[in-house]
């Protein structure tokens, strides 16, 4: 089955083709127009998607070495995301599927991230097998989920305020770094001292990694932002610039420590031997290293996508659509799916009942 996937939930316009269970193409266009604003401007994002989506889809189909008439299905993000941005890809995909007379499959963007570590890059790829803990970390979401054998899941922890990616970007802005600041902090931290200053790690405890831990698995990063701001205000600009690498490393260490401790604690608490880490923040080198070391220490299998599949991309949309079709989780000829802005577990599945 040949599946075209389309992703436009935020500031990446992406299209990919899944060819009989393997990725045939994955084209991504990242919007640069938001840099001077220090964040994504929704209206600009929508207009950029409108401007580029036709060429991106054409490129994906061409790179896959097929024609549009050889497509068997089209899938697109229906949410969560910036509602205007989501609508561009969703409406385009629904219209294209209707015109070609083939099924349309709506995909939950966060669920696509959850299973992105299992994107079929080759015939030998590992299919997702539950139960496992999924840590999904991005600019807009930070979630811990327990994925069962049938690949249904429960959200067991979420951020109470800011997402991890947002914490990176906002603390980076305090340091005068360009948007998006997450990758910049990662690069600076590589040559910094993560123990230069101990920033707070909210909702963690020394007992959290034990099987008997009875706390929650929620996250909070607003306190970290406040702490960073307060600390920076106490030091002169020259001092901050001199120790910029160390400060970046200390901020990154605080965020990564929380994510790693929570994920491992959840795996041990629910007695699972596997963790999947996905979302834009999963591209962070310190998080990847920390998760690898922690999982190795506790005998836990770690699944983490290549960095090209960590950020928003259409390959994960096409891949999850293929999985959904194989499980009979969607109905065919569904051309009237409404977009949604906020995450709700199983939102698409519920809308199809």
UniProtKB/Swiss-Prot annotation:
**Molecular function GO labels:** iron ion binding; N(6)-L-threonylcarbamoyladenine synthase activity
Alphabetical GO biological process terms: tRNA threonylcarbamoyladenosine modification
Which residues are involved in binding substrate? Answer: 136-140, 169, 182, 186, 284
Q: How is the cofactor bound?
A: Binds 1 Fe(2+) ion per subunit.
Which residues of the sequence carry a binding annotation for Fe cation? 109, 113, 312
Compartments where located: Cytoplasm
**What does this protein need as cofactor?**
Fe(2+)
Q: Which UniProt keywords apply?
A: Acyltransferase, Cytoplasm, Iron, Metal-binding, Transferase, tRNA processing
Pfam families tied to this protein: TsaD
The entry's family comment says: Belongs to the KAE1 / TsaD family.
In terms of PANTHER family, this protein maps to: TRNA N6-ADENOSINE THREONYLCARBAMOYLTRANSFERASE (PTHR11735), TRNA N6-ADENOSINE THREONYLCARBAMOYLTRANSFERASE, MITOCHONDRIAL (PTHR11735:SF6)
Protein name according to UniProt? tRNA N6-adenosine threonylcarbamoyltransferase
Q: Which organism is it from?
A: Chlorobium limicola (strain DSM 245 / NBRC 103803 / 6330)
């Amino acid at each position: 089955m040949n599946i075209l996937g389309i992703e436009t939930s935020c500031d990446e316009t992406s299209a990919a083709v899944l060819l009989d269970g393997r990725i045939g193409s994955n084209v991504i266009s990242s919007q640069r127009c938001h840099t001077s604003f220090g964040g994504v401007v929704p209206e600009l994002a929508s207009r950029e998607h409108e401007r580029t989506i036709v060429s991106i889809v054409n490129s994906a189909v061409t790179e896959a070495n097929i024609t549009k008439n050889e497509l068997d299905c089209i899938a697109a993000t229906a949410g969560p995301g910036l509602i205007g941005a989501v609508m561009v890809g969703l409406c385009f995909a629904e219209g294209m599927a209707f015109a070609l007379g083939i099924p349309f499959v709506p995909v939950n963007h966060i669920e696509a991230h959850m299973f992105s570590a299992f994107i079929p890059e080759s015939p030998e790829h590992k299919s997702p097998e539950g139960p496992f803990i999924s840590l999904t970390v991005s600019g807009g979401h930070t979630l811990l989920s327990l994925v069962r054998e049938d690949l249904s899941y429960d959200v067991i922890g979420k951020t109470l305020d800011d997402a991890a990616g947002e914490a990176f970007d906002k603390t980076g802005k305090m340091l005068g770094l360009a948007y998006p600041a997450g990758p910049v902090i990662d690069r600076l931290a590589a040559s910094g001292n993560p123990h230069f200053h101990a920033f707070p790690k909210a909702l963690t405890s020394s007992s959290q990694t034990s099987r008997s831990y009875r706390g929650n698995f929620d996250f909070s990063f607003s306190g970290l932002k406040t702490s960073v701001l307060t600390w920076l205000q106490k030091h002169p600009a020259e001092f901050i610039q001199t120790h910029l690498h160390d400060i970046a490393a200390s901020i990154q260490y605080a965020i990564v420590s929380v994510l790693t401790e929570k994920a491992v604690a959840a795996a041990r608490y629910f007695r699972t031997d596997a963790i999947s880490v996905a979302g834009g923040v999963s591209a962070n080198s310190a998080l990847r290293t920390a998760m690898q070391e922690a999982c190795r220490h506790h005998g836990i299998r770690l699944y983490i996508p290549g960095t090209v599949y960590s950020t928003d991309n259409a390959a994960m949309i096409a891949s999850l659509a293929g999985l959904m079709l194989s499980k009979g989780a969607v109905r065919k000829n569904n051309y009237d799916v409404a977009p949604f802005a906020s995450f709700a577990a199983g939102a698409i599945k519920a809308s199809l009942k």
